[in-house]
């Protein structure tokens, strides 16, 4: 499969300057594409467009030549955010949060070292690294084909970063997933990606 953007233009207001202008890229199944740029260049906005959270004013986001909206059921493009606490309901136990989109396979919970006792706990009772493991398990449902990692490990300690990337690279290889890895760290992108591009100014 291939995930593509063609000549994307996007701004957050009709009169505002565009955050993205004429942005085109392609990501193939099994590829690990790194995306580097300084802050404020529109990396997160691009991920939001690719995952269907926003719609461009111009251009298209296509999955195998079809608009993302044409795919029924769970979205085949998922995003893992930098701050996991912002994308989970603080009032729901984490087991219920996972079950909302279909309980992940037990092998994923085991591989991510998610303990059974954590399922009854609330987001505020877990560390950032523990919570990010939940978000990864939730994103990696069977229908997913492309995973967008937007600074997903930037706030974590080095040991947890290494554990998560080791898991992600193995999971992506076994399922032929396409990964888009957004990071300020050129060293990380060099280590985990098959190619890297820089966001234009």
Task: Locate each region found by the language model.
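A short, flexible loop at the N-terminus of ABC-type nucleotide-binding domains that lies
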Residues: 1-5, 9-22, 29
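The feature captures the beta-strand-to-loop junction immediately N-terminal to the Walker
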Residues: 36-38
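Helix-to-loop junction immediately C-terminal to a conserved catalytic motif
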Residues: 51
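ABC ATPase NBD coupling module
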Residues: 66-78, 92, 96
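Q-loop/switch helix immediately C-terminal to the Walker
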Residues: 83, 90-105
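Conserved ABC ATPase "signature" region
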Residues: 105-117
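Conserved ABC ATPase signature
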Residues: 122-126, 130
